[in-house]
Amino acid sequence: MKKLLPQASLLRLLVLPLLLLAMPSGRGALLSPLASPPDWSTLHRFSGVITASEFERLLRQVYVPDGSWRQWISLTPGQAIITPHDGATPVILPLASTESATKIPSRFWKERGQRSPQPGKPLAGLRIAIDPGHLGGKFARMEARWFQIGHSRPVEEGEMTLIVAKILKKKLEAMGAEVWLTRSRNGATTSLRPDKLKKAAALSLQEEGAPLSRTRLEFEAERLFYRVGEIRNRARLVNSVIRPDLVVCLHFNAEEWGNPARPTLTDKNHLHLLLSGGMSGNELLHEDERYTMLVKLLGGTHREELGASEAVARSLATATGLSPFTYHSANAIPASSNPYLWIRNLLANRLFECPVVYCEPYVMNSKPVFNRVQLADYEGRRNVGGLSLPSIYREYADAVAQGLADYYGGAAN
C-alpha cells in the first residue's frame, strides 16, 4: 500500500514549481505584480519641463514624502540623475534653469488653460474618461464589493458606479465634453483570469513573505485578477486608446461590514477624494512604480489634479452634506488644507498618465446609503427618512458634473 504524503508536503510540491518559474533570473529590476519593465529612455521627452527646486518640492511634499527617493534620484541645479535599478546606467534628465524657462511637457492631455470654454458649454473641447470602479456582476462577491440583507436589493459597488457613470456621461456631453467609459457593462475588461495567474500569485506571496497555502494562492490569484490585471488593462485603454485630458474614477466608500450575508450597518457616512502620490520606500523599490511616479510628476499632473479635485470636492460636499473622512495611517497624507483631499499611492491614479479625479463619497453600508440604494435610480425627488432627496446616483453625478464645470468652465477667467 502506497504511503500518502501529508497535505503540507503535497502543497509544497504543487507550489514549488510555480515559485521556480516565477523567480527572477539574476540581478536587475524588481517589478510589482503583472508589471512590464519600463522604457526609461521615454523620460527624455520631459527634458527642461521643470526646475530642480520644483522637482524636489513635488518629491518631498507629494510623491515620496518619506525621503526614500534619494536612493534613486539625485538633483543638481541643471539635471536630474535617475537610477533605473541597481547596476543600470543612469538616466540624465536636463532641468530648466528658471520657472520662466520651463518647456511644456510632451503629453497627450491638455491642461485647463489650453482650452477655451464656450457659452453654455463649459466643458467644450475637454476629453474625459469615466472609470466606474470595480467590476460588478458575477465578480462582485469575489472582489468583496457586495452585500445583502435578507431579501433586500443587493448593495454592489460595481453596479452602482456604472449607474453613476452612465448618468454622468450624458451630463458631461451636454456641457460639451467628449466622454468615454472604461467599461460600459458589468464584468472585466481584461482577458486575464485567476487560473492563469497562479505563477504571479506565488511570486507576489513570496515577496510579501506570506506563508503559502492553497487558499492563500487562490485568493492572491483572484486579487491579481480583479485589482491588478483589470486596472492595468483600463490604464492601457486610457493611455493608449482614449488619451483623455482627465479621468474621473467613481467609487463608493465602505466601513467594515463583516459577513456579506449578514452585514453590519453603520451610522458613519463621509466623503473624500484621492490624489496620486504618497509612495513609501518599499513601494519605490519596484522599478515600474518609480517610473510611473516620475511620469506623473514630470507630466505636471498634480496641479491639475489638485485644482479639479478641489472643485469636485466642494461640489460633492455641498450636495451631500457629508463630513470629510480622515485617515489615521502612514499610507495617506493631506493634499492641502482642504480636509476632503488626501494623497495615496493607488494603482489606478498612478497608472493613468493624465490628471485623475478619484471620488470616494458615501459609505455603502451606512444606514442612510443602504436605504437610498433600496430605492434604485429615479427621476425627481422622493421622501427619504423625512428628507426630499434625488436618487443617490443622480446626486453623485450632478455634483461631479457641477464641480468639473466650475473648474474647467472658469478657465477663461
List each language-model region with its residue ranges:
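A periodicity- and composition-biased signal for non-globular, repetitive helical segments
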Residues: 8-9, 18, 240, 257
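Bacterial N-terminal signal peptides
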Residues: 12-22
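Bacterial N-terminal signal peptides that target proteins for export
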Residues: 3-14
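Catalytic-site microenvironment of enzymes
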Residues: 26-413
